[in-house]
Amino acid sequence: MKFVILLTIGLLVVAAIPQRRQQQQQQQQQQQRDEREIPPFLEGAPPSVIDEFYNLLKTDENKTDQQTEADVEAFINRLGGSYKVRFTQFMEEVKKARADYERIHQQAVARFSPAAKDADARMSAIADSPHLTTRQKSQQIQAIMDSLSESVRREIINALSPQE
């Protein structure tokens, strides 16, 4: 009799393991969603829309900036309504932020050592290339940063880090 009870308990535990794993996976996925920063133009969007947006960005790592921008615009146009209005506002803010960054960047470059200026010029050419994918840009810029001496790397990072 004890054997039957132990066997039954064992079978129940074994049957519950896959269900428990599935619950843990669902909790992990929800945590990842909660930890992601939601772009302002998708505030209030259903989780499925936010997931779709992040999946789009992930697959677009192998596309050029122009291709990614076209994919994002098509995604936003498909959503329409207030998402489109908020996206337009967001892009205006991005344009201003880019102008501010470029001003700060130029001021920093003016103070760079010759080695930092050279590295910055190479990285800027990569970042501005319309022919490279996001992944290629990231890898090539990282390779340049990794090849720099510690002092030059710190010089660039400190100069371009937001000042508080």
From Swiss-Prot:
InterPro entries tied to this protein: ANIS5_cation-bd, SXP/RAL-2_related
Sequence segments annotated as region (Disordered): 24-43
Keywords: Signal
Tissue localization of expression: High levels in the hypodermal layer of the adult female.
Signal listed as a keyword: yes
Family annotation (Pfam families): ANIS5_cation-bd
Signal peptide: 1-16
Keyword Signal: yes
Disulfide bond sites: none
Protein family (similarity comment): Belongs to the SXP/RAL-2 family.
Protein name (database record): OV-17 antigen
Protein's organism: Onchocerca volvulus
